[in-house]
Regions:
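N-terminal secretory signal peptides
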Residues: 1-10
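Short, surface-exposed loop/turn segments at secondary-structure boundaries that line and modulate
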Residues: 3, 56-77, 87-128, 132, ...
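Short, small/polar residue-rich loop motifs at catalytic or cofactor-binding pockets
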Residues: 43-45
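Short, acidic, Ser/Thr-enriched surface-loop or helix-capping motifs
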Residues: 52
Length: 158
């Protein structure tokens, strides 16, 4: 049995109306909970950065990626402070709990082309704090002052 499909016209207004539900659905990670999040291994440097014993850096992203470049720009901001290549950062959806809400919308939401602006300081701060923690840990381990240490290419050096 065959059926001939005929194209239908779809107005821009109708497209926007019908795609709204899809965009909303893209914002709501299904089944993500604190329990699922706790499955990661490694040290949580802060709310957004986890570094595993194998040196895998994972960023917990509190914005959705749906072709808007959110994950790329957030990785770049974090990598800039950590002195690593942004492409080496693994991504994981952050839990949908208040500490990960957008500072702009005060809920778990990605909208209005504001990811870069709303995550600039949180990502840069998270990266800078994680870097400072790494330098402090190396300083204690190597018994040298932290100000003598540098970072670059995902490495702490003295």
């Amino acid at each position: 049995m065959s059926e001939t499909l005929t194209p239908r016209s779809l107005s821009r207004r109708r497209f926007v109306q019908s795609s709204g539900a899809l965009l909303f659905a893209a914002q709501c990670p299904v089944g993500l909970s604190r329990k699922a999040y706790a499955g990661g291994t490694g040290a949580m440097m802060n709310s957004f950065v986890r570094i595993d014993p194998s040196n895998v850096i994972t960023m917990l992203a509190n914005n959705s990626e749906f072709g808007n470049g959110a994950y790329t720009v957030m990785s770049m901001m974090l990598a800039e402070e950590l002195d690593v290549d942004y492409r080496s950062i693994a991504l994981e959806a952050a839990p949908t709990t208040p500490e990960y809400y957008s500072p702009l919308f005060r809920e778990y939401l990605t909208a209005g082309s504001v990811t870069t602006g709303s995550t600039f300081m949180p990502m840069r701060t998270a990266g800078a704090k994680a870097r400072a923690m790494l330098l402090e840990a190396a300083s204690k381990d190597w018994n040298v002052p932290a100000f003598e240490l540098t970072t670059g290419d995902a490495t702490v050096t003295h």
